[in-house]
């Protein structure tokens, strides 16, 4: 219920922002100015994008329902906020510096809402759908780029495809609406790329005339419900600077420079220090001297007297090892060395998340295994008919006893993959990872270790780019 309440509150805040956007007056030239029917072509083109691929994405998300639909509503809010910014840019000149950041803040906040939703729903059966959206929603930030935003959107689209490919693999022969959902979602970003190329090739096209867009409050000119109290009145002016102090400092500096300008003759005023005047030669001087005086402390602004508030203890998530539908969830296990899953079926998958210093054995034949955000994990399994994926992890060791067609390593530092004799034809697919090693069994029962290449060389051969592994001589 608490999660549902949080979701409702987030949606209410987003709706409030949109309502405020639609009511802001023209004289403020604010973020939410609604253009007239005669909107500039690039606003009309964005409306077309909302009415076609975005509408289809919302329709398919509603058919799937659940977390996918909730996520889509958040994405839709972000796109409508972006549309409001485009309408403002078509009527106003670009503000400078912090003022522009204020205009972009609602979009940035909505992007973070979308990402946070995925993080809070890692146990969702639609986790791959949520991840595809979460990894690519930052494409809405193209409006903040000063040059060539199109390639940035393409990069975000490619990030989404890493997860949409999983959705296709899981649902292609099971439920066609998930395939249509993937097609609709990716088309948003491909059409946005074409839109940017046509209207905003070198960045968001602001109006050359009209007033400068002012600081975005996202609120009507009058007070609104939920607005904070007025700011406190300014404090008293600072006391006048003492002129005598300034003259004293000036005189001191003049005297100092006069001494420096003496050059080597300044040493003539120095007095010889005999041994009986040195504390390390005459211990009696130490007893006579008082406490050592420290030099003047550098100036620091006075700090307000506030009582330190204790930091809230980090909430530790409960450890899980359970079968939820067709998914084995192994989460938040720490310092456990005897975890075993032995009642497996071919259609089941395993999702291993945030396990630290833990060993897990999966017996029997299973569809796929995903290792996400784990450290010092040891995984032993018999047979996997699909893929074993290691993501966002560190120091992971996996060993196949039977057969596996593919092992994918992504954003991982330190991964050892021990293959069996029956899995020597396994494909190792890696990206953004380091310290990867594949261990091949020998006749004597030992393993030979082979590092996976991490450094490459790319050349243009006149027609295409050719990439080869770079051999580094030891």
From Swiss-Prot:
Residues found modified as Phosphoserine: 34, 289, 294, 300, 307, 309
UniProt GO BP: actin cytoskeleton organization; ameboidal-type cell migration; cell morphogenesis; modification of postsynaptic actin cytoskeleton; receptor-mediated endocytosis
GO MF annotation terms: actin binding
Biased composition (Low complexity): 217-227
Known function: Directly regulates filament dynamics and has been implicated in a number of complex developmental and morphological processes, including mRNA localization and the establishment of cell polarity.
Cross-link (Glycyl lysine isopeptide (Lys-Gly) (interchain with G-Cter in SUMO1)): 347
Pfam families: CAP_C, CAP_N, CAP_N-CM
Name of the protein this chain belongs to: Adenylyl cyclase-associated protein 1
Summary of subunit composition and partner proteins: Homodimer. Binds actin monomers.
Matching SMART domains: CARP (SM00673)
UniProt entry tagged with the keyword Cell membrane: yes
Keywords recorded for this protein, A-Z: Acetylation, Actin-binding, Cell membrane, Isopeptide bond, Membrane, Methylation, Phosphoprotein, Ubl conjugation
PANTHER family assigned to the protein according to its UniProt record, in alphabetical order: ADENYLYL CYCLASE-ASSOCIATED PROTEIN (PTHR10652), ADENYLYL CYCLASE-ASSOCIATED PROTEIN 1 (PTHR10652:SF1)
Region listing for Disordered, in residue ranges: 215-253, 277-316
Source species: Mus musculus (Mouse)
Taxonomic lineage from the root: Eukaryota, Metazoa, Chordata, Craniata, Vertebrata
Tissue-level expression: Ubiquitous.
Coarse class of the protein's main subcellular location: membrane
Residue stretches of biased makeup (Pro residues): 228-241, 299-311
One GO cellular component term: extracellular region
Residue positions, PTM Phosphothreonine: 306
Family membership: Belongs to the CAP family.
Residue stretches making up the C-CAP/cofactor C-like domain: 312-452
């Amino acid at each position: 219920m608490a999660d549902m309440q949080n979701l409702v509150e987030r949606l209410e805040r987003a709706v409030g922002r949109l309502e405020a956007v639609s009511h802001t007056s023209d004289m403020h030239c604010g973020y939410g100015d609604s253009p007239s029917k005669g909107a500039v072509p690039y606003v009309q083109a964005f409306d077309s994008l909302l009415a076609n691929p975005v509408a289809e994405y919302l329709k398919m998300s509603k058919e799937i329902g659940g977390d996918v639909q909730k996520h889509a509503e958040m994405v839709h809010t972000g796109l409508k906020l972006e549309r409001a910014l485009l309408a403002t840019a078509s009527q106003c000149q670009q503000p400078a510096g912090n003022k522009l950041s204020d205009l972009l803040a609602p979009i940035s906040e909505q992007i973070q809402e979308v990402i946070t939703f995925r993080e809070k729903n890692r146990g969702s059966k639609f986790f791959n759908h949520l991840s595809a959206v979460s990894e690519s929603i930052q494409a809405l930030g193209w409006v903040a780029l000063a040059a060539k935003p199109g390639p940035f959107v393409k990069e975000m689209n490619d990030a989404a495809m890493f997860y949409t490919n999983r959705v296709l693999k899981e649902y292609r022969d099971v439920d066609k609406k998930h395939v249509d959902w993937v097609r609709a979602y990716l088309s948003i970003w491909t059409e946005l790329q074409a839109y940017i190329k046509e209207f905003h090739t070198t960045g968001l096209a602001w109006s050359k005339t009209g007033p400068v867009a002012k600081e975005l409050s996202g609120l009507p000119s009058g007070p609104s419900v939920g607005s904070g109290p007025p700011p406190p009145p300014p404090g008293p002016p600072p006391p006048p600077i003492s002129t005598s102090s300034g003259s004293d400092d000036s005189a001191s500096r003049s005297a100092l420079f006069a001494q420096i300008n003496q050059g080597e003759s300044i040493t003539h005023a120095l007095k010889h220090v005999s041994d009986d005047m040195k504390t390390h030669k005459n211990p009696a001087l130490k007893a006579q001297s008082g406490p050592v005086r420290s030099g003047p402390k550098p100036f620091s602004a006075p700090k307000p007297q506030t009582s330190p508030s204790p930091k809230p203890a980090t909430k530790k998530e409960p450890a899980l090892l359970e079968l939820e539908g067709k998914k084995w969830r192994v989460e938040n296990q720490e310092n456990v060395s005897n975890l075993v899953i032995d009642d497996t079926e071919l259609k089941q998958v395993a999702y291993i998340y945030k396990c630290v210093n833990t060993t897990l054995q999966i017996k029997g034949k299973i569809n796929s295994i995903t290792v996400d955000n784990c450290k010092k994990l040891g995984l032993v399994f018999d047979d996997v008919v699909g893929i074993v994926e290691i993501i966002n992890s560190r120091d992971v060791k996996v060993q196949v006893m039977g057969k596996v067609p593919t092992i994918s390593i992504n954003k991982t530092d330190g991964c050892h993959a021990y293959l069996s004799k029956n899995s020597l034809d396994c494909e190792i697919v890696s990206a953004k990872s380091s310290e990867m090693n594949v261990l091949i069994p020998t006749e004597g029962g030992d393993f030979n270790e082979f590092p996976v290449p991490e450094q490459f060389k790319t050349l243009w051969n006149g027609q295409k780019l050719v990439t080869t592994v770079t051999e580094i001589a030891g």
